[in-house]
């Protein structure tokens, strides 16, 4: 059943506050990982396979517990590489293999998202 308007408003606020806290915690952790990577000249990829917190409440007021199909960010930190625009989840494994200097198996049909920085 659909919650009452007042209950729905409280629920939405609590859920959104929890989502914001979770995102802030992730931001702090990612910052630490990236700073460590930069200090040690590591290549780092930060990715996600789905979204959710950007659409936490359905239009009818019920909670959205499903993963969204919205685009998610992919972040590469490296001094000599950058990503091309756009890609799909299937491109991640070939990208990681290229970063590791490992040849992509023929069974992988997707491509790496890397290319050198244009100078």
Question: Predicted segment positions?
Answer:
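Short active-site-adjacent structural elements
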Residues: 9, 53-56, 82-84
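Substrate-binding rim/cap in mid-to-C-terminal beta-strand-loop elements of soluble/periplasmic
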Residues: 61-95, 99-100
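Single conserved hydrophobic/aromatic residue that forms the stacking wall/gate
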Residues: 1-7, 11
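Short, internal active-site loops enriched in acidic
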Residues: 8, 49-53, 119
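Polar, surface-exposed loop/tail segments
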Residues: 102-119
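Metal-dependent active-site segment of extracytoplasmic phospho-/sulfohydrolases and closely related
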Residues: 15-60, 96
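Structural beta-strand/beta-sheet cores of well-ordered domains, especially the beta-sheet scaffolds
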Residues: 1, 40-43, 70-73
């Amino acid at each position: 059943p659909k919650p009452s308007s007042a209950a729905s408003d409280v629920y939405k606020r609590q859920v959104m506050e929890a989502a914001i806290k979770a995102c802030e915690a992730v931001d702090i952790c990612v910052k630490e990982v990236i700073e460590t990577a930069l200090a040690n000249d590591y290549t780092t990829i930060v990715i996600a396979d789905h979204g959710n917190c950007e659409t936490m409440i359905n239009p009818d007021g019920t909670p959205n517990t499903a993963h969204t199909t919205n685009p998610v960010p992919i972040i590469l930190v490296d001094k000599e590489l950058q990503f091309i625009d756009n890609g799909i989840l299937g491109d991640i494994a070939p990208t990681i293999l290229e970063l590791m200097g490992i040849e992509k198996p023929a069974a992988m049909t997707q491509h790496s998202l890397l290319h050198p920085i244009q100078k």
